[in-house]
Amino acid sequence: MDIKIYTQDGCFYCDQMKELCKRAEVEYETIQVTTQEMNALYPKATSYPYVIIDGEEIGGLIESAKFFLKEGLVSANKG
């Protein structure tokens, strides 16, 4: 699985996305971008992090968490 996380400095939700990947025990690549770079790469991206998995635009943290749940990479159990 090829996971790219587009981030900005000081982004709390970006850190949460990285934690989700660690919890799921999947490798990921972080790519720091400016807003201008992000707009040029992925015009429909509206927030950070912006996650691409196997070339598919997944979206932000919530969409990525739903994807991980659907794929069985993490469970909804809290403990």
Predicted segments, located by residue:
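Charged, surface-exposed interaction regions in soluble eukaryotic proteins
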Residues: 18, 28-30, 51
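A generic structural signal for ordered secondary structure
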Residues: 13, 24, 33, 57-62
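Local sequence-structure signature of Cys/Sec-based thiol-disulfide redox active-site neighborhoods
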Residues: 1-26
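Non-catalytic, surface beta->alpha helical segment in thiol-disulfide oxidoreductase systems
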Residues: 53-79
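Thioredoxin-like thiol-disulfide oxidoreductase module
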Residues: 29-46
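Structural micro-motif
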Residues: 42-52, 61-62
